[in-house]
């Protein structure tokens, strides 16, 4: 533009009519400079605003990057927490498995100990049977020792009442102990049921814990899958954000390049506009000059025509002036040609500038469209960033909720596990206590069973000794009858003395038998009263214990049929072992009462001196009939009748003969045996007293 202005100025200087346009051109240039400065300030403001927007966007991108880094760190922390939780859970599962193994081992130990106890009981039962066989052999040895009861009959009568009281108390204690043993057996059965219920409950709890562990593992797997999914989404978001950042950077670079192009195009546009305006002004000035020149040409034509007419009129006179007019016309024509050529040049430049303006306007439109598209893309990116931020917030909330739920679930599991461990510890303590009490009770029952069996064996021994005494008494009665017959033939004894002695002996026997019957009735009544009182006391004592044992837990299972049968067999065996001596005694005493009939012949010869008459024989034969009437009453008092027999045998004075020496030896041996048996009975009663006191103390301590 400046070059054009310089050329125009040079051309104007070449002509005189262009000097008047310089001032206007300078004013136009000033206005153009002002316009350019104004536009420049506007464009600078816009560029500054765009730069501030870009800086804000860069800051936002930096914040987003920082947030993404924070999220990455949080995700890493979450991964570490998840790994720690997994390790803790694995450790907890290992601990639970170890505890479960310990419980299984303890249950196996309990089962083995219980089986060992059962085997020991069976072995002891078999050993007791073997002991019974050994005792039978001992009974055969001790059959001869029962004859010692004859000499010490008076001492036995004195101590009989004491022994009867002791026996009644011991029987009452025995019944109480039997009832206690039954109750203890019931308690043992209940404890077995409780052990089974504890085993079942422990198995159910183990299954419950295993199901809970499986559920926890499933939740952990689900949480891990969610965390992986969230990490994938976060990684995708990070990748998209990185791509967005790269695109934004590329777009920023393109914007900068487009801004630079716009600035260059705007500068070119300004220059073109200034050149166009200067050219339009020049064209307008050229047109004005052309119009002036045309008017001058018209005036010159008119003047030329007038002058031609005048020349024609003055042909020769005016020849000098015609040469000058033609030179002016030539100059005017040359100027007109120059103006035409300059106009053509200006029009070509105007068309060229218009084409360049159109191209610049098209490029400006394209750049503006690109800017609008970039603004829209920036808005979209902002919307996507907002969406990503919202999604990140949601993910954080979900992660926090998952952590809270996981922590609450862990706390609940820990509480449940602590509660279950406490319950298992309490159950272990209760099982240990029940084991100790059951072992103690079993030991007591074994001791009591052994004592009862020993008593039964002793009772059987006594009965066998009584049977042997029966046989010996029969043999002695036969020997005495033979001896009496020999004495009756050899010597003559006064009938009056024999009758008196015989009547006195009979009266003594009858009175003693009546006293013994009364004593037996009194002892029986006392025993019945004591048994009833002991039953009432035992019911009162053992009812609260039975309630406590039954109300030990609500969850108890019924014992099996085999256990009931086994316990019932044991109790029946125990009862039969206790009550069989009585039956055997009653069965063995019945035939002993029959032996009393031949005892009277032993008395009559003892009281007679030398001879017997038919009256004495009739009396001696009438004595068994009198004694047979009292057989039913004397079925339980064989020992007392034997004592009476010993009294009469001691009161009689046998003559010196080989039969008398045999009888004296027999009596001496029986004295020794009776003394030994009395010592054994005293020791046995003392042992029974001690054991009964111990058992009473133990039961009082348990209560």
UniProtKB/Swiss-Prot annotation:
Its main location: cytoplasm. Keywords: Acetylation, Cell cycle, Cell division, Coiled coil, Cytoplasm, Cytoskeleton, DNA damage, Mitosis, Phosphoprotein, Ubl conjugation. GO terms for biological process: cell division; centriole replication; de novo centriole assembly involved in multi-ciliated epithelial cell differentiation; DNA damage checkpoint signaling; negative regulation of protein K63-linked ubiquitination; protein stabilization; signal transduction in response to DNA damage; spindle assembly. The modification Phosphoserine is found at residue 278. It comes from the Eukaryota. It is found in: Cytoplasm, Cytoskeleton, Microtubule organizing center, Centrosome; Cytoplasm, Cytoskeleton, Microtubule organizing center, Centrosome, Centriole; Cytoplasm, Cytoskeleton, Microtubule organizing center, Centrosome, Centriolar satellite. Residues 77-199, 242-303, 346-533 form a coiled coil. The modification N-acetylmethionine is found at residue 1. Polyubiquitinated via 'Lys-48'-linked ubiquitin, leading to its degradation. Deubiquitinated by USP36, promoting its stabilization. GO terms for cellular component: centriolar satellite; centriole; centrosome; cytoplasm; spindle pole. Interacts with CEP152 and CDK1; these interactions recruit both ligands to centrosomes. Interacts with CDK2, CDK5RAP2, WDR62, CEP90, KIAA0753/moonraker and CCDC14. CEP63, CDK5RAP2, CEP152, WDR62 are proposed to form a stepwise assembled complex at the centrosome forming a ring near parental centrioles. Interacts with CCDC57; the interaction is required for their location to proximal end of centrioles. Interacts with FXR1; promoting its stabilization. PANTHER family: CENTROSOMAL PROTEIN OF 63 KDA, SARCOMA ANTIGEN NY-SAR-24/CYTOSKELETAL PROTEIN SOJO. Belongs to the CEP63 family. Required for normal spindle assembly. Plays a key role in mother-centriole-dependent centriole duplication; the function seems also to involve CEP152, CDK5RAP2 and WDR62 through a stepwise assembled complex at the centrosome that recruits CDK2 required for centriole duplication. Reported to be required for centrosomal recruitment of CEP152; however, this function has been questioned. Also recruits CDK1 to centrosomes. Plays a role in DNA damage response. This is Centrosomal protein of 63 kDa. It comes from Macaca fascicularis (Crab-eating macaque). The gene is CEP63.
């Amino acid at each position: 533009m400046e070059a054009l202005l310089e050329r125009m100025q040079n051309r104007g200087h070449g002509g005189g009519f262009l000097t008047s346009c310089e001032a206007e051109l300078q004013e136009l240039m000033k206005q153009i400079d002002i316009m350019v400065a104004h536009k420049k300030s506007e464009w600078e403001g816009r560029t500054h605003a765009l730069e501030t927007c870009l800086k804000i966007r860069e800051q936002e991108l930096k914040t987003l990057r920082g947030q993404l880094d924070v999220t990455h760190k949080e995700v890493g922390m979450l991964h570490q927490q998840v790994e720690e939780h997994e390790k803790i859970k694995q450790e907890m599962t290992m601990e639970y498995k170890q505890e479960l193994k310990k419980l299984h081992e303890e249950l196996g130990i309990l089962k083995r100990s219980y089986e060992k106890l059962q085997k020991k009981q069976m072995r002891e039962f078999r050993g007791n049977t073997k002991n019974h066989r050994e005792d039978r052999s001992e009974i055969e040895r001790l059959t001869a020792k029962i004859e010692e009861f004859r000499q010490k009959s008076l001492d036995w009568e004195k101590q009989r009442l004491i022994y009867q009281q002791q026996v009644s108390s011991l029987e009452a204690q025995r019944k109480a102990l039997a009832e206690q043993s039954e109750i203890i057996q019931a308690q043992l059965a209940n404890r077995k049921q409780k052990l089974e219920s504890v085993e079942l409950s422990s198995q159910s709890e183990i299954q419950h814990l295993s199901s809970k562990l499986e559920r926890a593992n499933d939740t952990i797997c689900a949480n891990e899958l969610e965390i992986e999914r969230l990490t994938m989404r976060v990684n995708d978001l990070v990748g998209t954000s990185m791509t967005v950042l790269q695109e934004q950077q590329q777009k920023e670079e393109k914007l900068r390049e487009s801004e630079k192009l716009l600035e260059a195009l705007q500068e070119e546009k300004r220059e073109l506009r200034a050149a166009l305006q200067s050219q339009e002004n020049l064209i307008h000035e050229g047109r004005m000059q052309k119009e002036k020149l045309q008017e001058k040409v018209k005036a010159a034509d008119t003047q030329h025509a007038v002058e031609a007419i005048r020349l024609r009129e003055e042909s020769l006179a005016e020849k000098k002036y015609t040469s000058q007019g033609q030179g002016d016309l030539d100059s005017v024509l040359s100027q007109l040609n120059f103006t035409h050529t300059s106009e053509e040049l200006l029009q070509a430049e105007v068309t060229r500038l218009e084409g360049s303006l159109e191209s610049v306007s098209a490029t400006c439109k394209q750049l503006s469209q690109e800017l609008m598209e970039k603004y829209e893309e920036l808005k979209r990116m902002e919307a996507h960033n907002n969406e990503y931020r919202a999604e990140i917030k949601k993910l954080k909330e979900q992660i926090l909720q998952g952590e809270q739920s996981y922590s609450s679930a862990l706390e609940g599991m820990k509480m449940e596990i602590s509660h279950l461990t406490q319950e298992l510890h309490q159950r272990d303590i209760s099982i240990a206590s029940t084991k100790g009490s059951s072992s103690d009770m079993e030991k007591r029952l074994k001791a009591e069973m052994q004592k009862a069996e020993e008593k039964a064996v002793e009772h059987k021994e006594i009965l066998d000794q009584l049977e042997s005494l029966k046989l010996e008494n029969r043999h002695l009665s036969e020997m005495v009858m033979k001896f009496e017959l020999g004495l009756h033939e050899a010597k003559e004894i006064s009938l009056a003395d024999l009758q008196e002695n015989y009547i006195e002996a009979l009266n003594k026997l009858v009175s003693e038998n009546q006293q013994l019957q009364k004593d037996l009735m009194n002892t029986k009544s006392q025993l019945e009263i004591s048994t009833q009182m002991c039953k009432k006391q035992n019911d009162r004592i053992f009812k609260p214990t039975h309630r406590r044992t039954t109300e030990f837990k609500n969850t108890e299972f019924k014992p099996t049929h085999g256990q009931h049968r086994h316990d019932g067999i044991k109790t029946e065996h125990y009862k039969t072992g206790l009550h069989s001596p009585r039956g055997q005694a009653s069965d063995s005493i019945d035939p002993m009462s029959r032996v009393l009939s031949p005892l009277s012949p032993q008395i009559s010869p003892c009281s007679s001196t030398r001879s017997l008459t038919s009256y004495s024989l009739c009396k001696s034969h009438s004595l068994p009939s009198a004694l047979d009437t009292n057989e039913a009453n004397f079925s339980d008092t064989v020992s007392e009748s034997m004592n009476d027999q010993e009294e009469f045998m001691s009161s009689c004075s046998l003559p010196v003969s080989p039969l008398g020496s045999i009888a004296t030896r027999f009596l001496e041996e029986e004295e020794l045996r009776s003394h030994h048996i009395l010592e054994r009975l005293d020791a046995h009663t003392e042992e029974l007293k001690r054991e009964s006191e111990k058992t009473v103390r133990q039961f009082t301590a348990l209560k």
